[in-house]
C-alpha cells in the first residue's frame, strides 16, 4: 500500500476524566478544566462504593487489599449497589469544562475500570480470573457484565449530551507483559458480547471507540475485532 501522509497520535486527542465521576478521584486520574488533584485528594470510594488507596510513589491507586467485597459472583446483587449516573451533577461539570471542546483536537471520554477491571475491584485478581472460567459463576458474571455495560452506555450518553465528545476510550487491561490473563476463547465468551454492545452504541452515536488494554495481547486481537473495537491501545 501507499505511505500515509499523516497518522493520528495521542497528541491529536483531548481527553476528559471529570471529578463528577468519583472513580476518577478514587483512581487519582481526574483531569478536567481545573488544577489536577493533590495526592491527599486521591483515593476513597468509587461509584460502586469500593475503597481505593492512592500510592503516591507510582502515581496511581489500587483497591484496599486483603478483603475482597465479593467472594462468589453469584452473590453480586446482594453485595454490590449499582450507581445511577442520572444522579451525577453533569450540568455543573459541563459548564466547568466547556472550554475543552474548543481545543481543536478530537475530544474523548476516558472511562476507567472496564468490565474485567471492575470485576477485579470487586473480587481481587485471583477471584476475578477464576470467576471467568468457573461454570458455577459464569452465568452471574454475564449478568453483572450486562448491567455494567448498561452503566457505561448511560455514562457515554451523558458525555455526548454535556461535553460533546467525539470518541470513547475504555480502560480494561487484559494481560501482563508476557501474555494475556485469559484465553482467546474466554475473552470471546465472557467479555466480547458486552464490549461489542458498548462499541456498537458508540458507533450508532457517531463516535469512535478505543479499548486501552495493557499487556502482550496479540493473541486477543481477534476478540478486539469481534468486539467492533476501532483501536486497541496497549
Predicted regions and their residues:
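Generic detection of intrinsically disordered/low-complexity segments and helix-coil linkers/edges
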Residues: 23-25, 38, 42, 46, ...
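Short aromatic-enriched loop/helix-cap "lid" or pocket-rim segments at secondary-structure transitions
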Residues: 20-23, 41, 56-58, 64-65, ...
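Active-site loop segments of alpha/beta catalytic cores
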Residues: 1-16, 45, 54, 79-234
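Short, charged/polar low-complexity linear motifs in solvent-exposed/disordered segments
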Residues: 14, 26, 70-72, 228-229
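Feature activates predominantly on carbohydrate-active enzymes
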Residues: 57-91
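Ligand-binding pocket scaffold of soluble enzyme catalytic domains
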Residues: 49
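Segments that shape or occlude catalytic/ligand-binding pockets
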Residues: 3-7, 12-43
Amino acid at each position: 500500500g501507499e505511505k500515509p501522509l499523516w497518522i493520528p497520535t495521542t497528541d491529536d486527542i483531548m481527553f476528559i476524566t471529570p471529578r463528577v465521576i468519583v472513580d476518577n478521584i478514587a483512581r487519582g486520574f481526574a483531569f478536567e478544566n481545573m488544577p489536577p488533584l493533590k495526592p491527599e485528594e486521591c483515593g476513597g470510594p468509587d461509584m460502586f462504593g469500593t475503597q481505593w488507596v492512592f500510592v503516591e510513589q507510582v502515581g496511581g491507586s489500587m483497591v484496599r487489599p486483603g478483603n475482597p467485597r465479593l467472594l462468589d459472583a453469584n452473590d453480586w446483587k446482594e453485595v454490590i449497589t449499582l450507581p445511577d449516573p442520572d444522579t451525577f451533577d453533569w450540568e455543573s461539570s459541563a459548564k466547568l469544562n466547556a472550554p475543552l471542546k474548543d481545543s481543536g483536537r478530537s475530544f474523548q471520554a476516558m472511562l476507567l475500570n472496564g468490565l474485567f477491571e471492575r470485576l477485579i475491584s470487586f473480587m481481587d485478581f485471583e477471584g476475578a480470573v477464576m470467576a471467568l472460567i468457573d461454570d458455577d459463576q459464569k452465568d452471574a458474571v454475564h449478568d453483572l457484565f450486562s448491567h455494567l455495560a448498561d452503566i457505561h452506555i448511560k455514562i457515554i450518553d451523558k458525555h455526548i449530551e454535556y461535553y460533546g465528545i467525539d470518541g470513547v476510550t475504555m480502560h480494561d487491561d487484559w494481560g501482563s507483559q508476557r501474555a494475556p490473563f485469559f484465553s482467546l476463547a474466554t475473552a470471546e465468551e465472557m467479555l466480547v458480547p458486552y464490549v461489542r454492545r458498548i462499541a456498537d452504541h458508540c458507533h450508532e452515536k457517531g463516535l469512535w471507540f478505543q479499548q486501552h488494554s495493557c499487556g502482550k495481547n496479540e493473541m486477543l486481537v481477534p476478540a478486539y475485532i469481534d468486539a467492533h473495537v476501532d483501536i486497541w491501545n496497549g
